[in-house]
């Protein structure tokens, strides 16, 4: 009697944060069962974990309606590639990570092919387009959600769901002490440090980095000796930011890989919205969140969004723990003013840190990737 063939798993992560979470899941799944093989859409982290990437996720990381339309050709080609792979040689399981509009199209193909679907990191259906939960109920076999408030939402819709904790709770930790990090980055411990976090997508760099740098110039003028540091996302290259830095005339320390060490040396951070706000919250660093998209995207979204906040750390908290500067509010003057308040007002800063500590409590304990890997093995019919 021959041995059963190795199980094949397609995994789809369309942007930098999904690439990171997907890589940790794959590592844990392979630790539990080294015979599994993974292929799909991912970036450098997933490739390093052993995933055969048929499409690079950096090509697909765009935000907003207008931006998606501009990249339609690339996104459609990626969809066609996955559709062909699923229909010609169906995998034993499809794992989808966030990236909802694209991933739901892939889920539909998988459903027709009889492939089981695990959705890890829920689309934000609780925030906007809540009707999508009906489609999820039809196309997805299991949800692995990372926020506790998502569980009753899916249970009400009849979708099998498990709260697995948040993957960031496992990994948000500096690799050295603050004093060691300051020395490693060449920063003066006696001077203030402000983090500039312009995002992981080229579109964000083009749209938001200039105003962040303008705010930094204002801060430089108001706080002599202030220092700036920027963590460069793995999805970007020096060439993506160099022209902006050169035009600004600012001295900015650019760091790769050590993002949590970067965070811990900062007195305050100016950041784009997204997963990074949770990482900063877990590190307990005061921040100001900046969010701008095209006017059309914003007007459409304003009519659809059902939550009171843009920043996911504020959504988790259920209150505005840190300021959000949206669209026309996101000026260099406003950004500099909010950062300046952290630098000048210790009571305000401590109140913010206490709010961020509450966010950490709500994100659960570690072990997220192991719990999701257990679900993967269960759906593949394997014993742990």
Swiss-Prot record:
Top-rank EC class of the record's enzyme: transferase
Biological function: Condensation of UDP-2,3-diacylglucosamine and 2,3-diacylglucosamine-1-phosphate to form lipid A disaccharide, a precursor of lipid A, a phosphorylated glycolipid that anchors the lipopolysaccharide to the outer membrane of the cell.
Record GO cellular component, one term: membrane
Protein name: Lipid-A-disaccharide synthase
EC number: 2.4.1.182
Pfam families: LpxB
Keywords linked to the UniProt accession: Glycosyltransferase, Lipid A biosynthesis, Lipid biosynthesis, Lipid metabolism, Transferase
The keyword Lipid metabolism appears for this protein: yes
Catalytic activity field: a lipid X + a UDP-2-N,3-O-bis[(3R)-3-hydroxyacyl]-alpha-D-glucosamine = a lipid A disaccharide + UDP + H(+)
Organism: Geobacter metallireducens (strain ATCC 53774 / DSM 7210 / GS-15)
Pathway, per record: Bacterial outer membrane biogenesis; LPS lipid A biosynthesis
Xref: PANTHER family: LIPID-A-DISACCHARIDE SYNTHASE (PTHR30372), LIPID-A-DISACCHARIDE SYNTHASE, MITOCHONDRIAL-RELATED (PTHR30372:SF4)
A GO BP entry: lipid A biosynthetic process
InterPro entries in the record: Glyco_trans_19
């Amino acid at each position: 009697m021959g041995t059963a063939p190795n199980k094949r798993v397609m995994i789809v992560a369309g942007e930098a944060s999904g690439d990171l979470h997907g890589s940790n899941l794959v590592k844990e799944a392979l630790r539990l069962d080294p015979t599994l093989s993974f292929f799909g859409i991912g970036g450098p982290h997933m490739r390093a974990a052993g995933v055969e990437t048929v499409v690079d996720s950096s090509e697909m990381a765009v935000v907003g309606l207008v931006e998606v339309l501009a990249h339609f050709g690339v996104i459609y080609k990626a969809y066609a590639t996955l559709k062909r792979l699923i229909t010609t040689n169906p995998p034993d399981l499809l794992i989808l990570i966030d990236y909802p509009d694209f991933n739901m199209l892939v889920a539909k193909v998988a459903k027709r092919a009889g492939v089981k679907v695990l959705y890890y990191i829920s689309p934000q259906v609780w925030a906007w387009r809540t009707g999508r939960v009906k489609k999820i109920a039809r196309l997805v076999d299991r949800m692995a959600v990372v926020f506790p408030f998502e569980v009753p939402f899916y249970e009400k819709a009849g979708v099998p769901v498990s709260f697995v904790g948040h993957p960031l709770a496992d990994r948000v930790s500096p690799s050295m002490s603050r004093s060691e990090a300051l020395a490693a980055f060449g920063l003066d411990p006696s001077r203030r440090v402000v983090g500039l976090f312009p995002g992981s997508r080229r579109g964000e760099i083009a749209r938001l980095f200039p105003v962040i740098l303008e705010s930094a110039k204002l801060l430089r003028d108001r706080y002599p000796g202030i220092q700036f540091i920027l963590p460069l996302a793995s999805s970007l290259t020096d060439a993506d930011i160099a022209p902006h830095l050169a035009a600004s005339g600012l001295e900015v320390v650019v760091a790769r890989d050590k993002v949590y060490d970067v965070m811990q040396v900062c007195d305050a951070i100016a950041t784009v919205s997204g997963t990074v706000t949770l990482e900063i919250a877990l590190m307990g660093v005061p921040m100001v969140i900046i969010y701008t998209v095209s006017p059309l995207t914003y007007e459409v979204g304003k009519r659809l969004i059902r939550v009171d906040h843009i920043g996911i750390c504020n959504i988790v908290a259920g209150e505005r723990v840190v300021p959000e500067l949206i669209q026309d509010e996101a000026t260099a003057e406003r950004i500099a003013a909010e950062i300046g308040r952290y630098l000048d007002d210790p009571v305000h800063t401590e109140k913010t840190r206490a709010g961020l500590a509450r966010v950490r409590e709500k994100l659960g304990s570690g072990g997220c990737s192991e719990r999701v890997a257990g679900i993967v093995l269960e759906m593949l019919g394997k014993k742990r």
